[in-house]
Amino acid sequence: QLTFTPNWGT
């Protein structure tokens, strides 16, 4: 499973 953390979701 890949966990993606968007930086443009602040």
UniProtKB/Swiss-Prot annotation:
Posttranslational modification: The glycosylated tryptophan appears to be identical to the C-linked mannose found in mammals, but lacks the typical W-X-X-W motif. The carbohydrate moiety is not necessary for hypertrehalosaemic activity.
A GO term for molecular function: hormone activity
Location of Threonine amide modifications: 10
InterPro entries: Adipokinetic_hormone_CS
Disulfide cross-links: none
KW S-adenosyl-L-methionine (keyword) present: no
Residues bearing glycans: 8
Annotated compartments: Secreted
GO cellular component annotations of the record: extracellular region
Top-level taxon of origin: Eukaryota
An annotated GO BP: neuropeptide signaling pathway
Major subcellular site: secreted
Alphabetical keyword list: Amidation, Glycoprotein, Hormone, Neuropeptide, Pyrrolidone carboxylic acid, Secreted
Residue numbers bearing the Pyrrolidone carboxylic acid modification: 1
Function: Hypertrehalosaemic factors are neuropeptides that elevate the level of trehalose in the hemolymph (trehalose is the major carbohydrate in the hemolymph of insects).
Sequence similarity: Belongs to the AKH/HRTH/RPCH family.
Name the UniProt record assigns to this protein: Hypertrehalosaemic factor 2
Organism of derivation: Carausius morosus (Indian stick insect)
